[in-house]
Amino acid sequence: MAMTEESVDQVEVNCLCVQHGQSCNNTRCFVKEGLRANWFYNPVLEEFAIPDSYQEGHGVNVKITFSHRSRNTGQIPLCLSNGTCHISEKGLHFSANFSKDGLYIAIINETNYHAAEHYYLVYIYENCHQMPYDSPRHTGHNGTSFNWSMGLWLVKCSHNKTFFLPFVLDSAKSAPIIMTETAITIYISMIFLIVSLLTFLNVLITLNNKYKHYGV
């Protein structure tokens, strides 16, 4: 993202190399002072491309603050007053105050909940409506230092708005697989039960017809 007049209070961090097509040309991003650099990831995000219009010219001022919620709500990070934030598998809630409407890029790096590292790319721009992005939202990456996926959300937001983004980690992602396996087991059991009942009814009908034939 390019530095603009609106972003003079930001510090440059060598934190992002978004792959543009087959090559990586953008190796800079800007974060507001006070954000911890370890929220951002330096090496190339392989096998991922974003449109040209998202590449440059959007380094406007953005202030991101994190809020703490009970883990029981299912939306929880554990955020500390010193600016560090540990994301749980349930999600991340934060508010953003923008100096002007525009596009913002943020990568959040969670390394404390699981041994593996997880990276999330978030696009934020005007009018405050969450939108799906036509790129895969969960894409596995091989040969990189993280072994699960990258979640991508488009959020339209004007300045001084608060919004929620539902981040999902690998432990939560495994739940649908478990549910699918359970569903398959249930379906097979139901089919077996139905077949057994039909067989039993067929035996009863056969015996009944036989008894009628012999006048029992």
Curated annotation (Swiss-Prot):
Keywords: Early protein, Glycoprotein. Glycans are attached at residues 25, 82, 97, 109, 142, 147, 160. It comes from the Viruses. This is Early E3 25 kDa glycoprotein. It comes from Canine adenovirus serotype 1 (strain CLL).
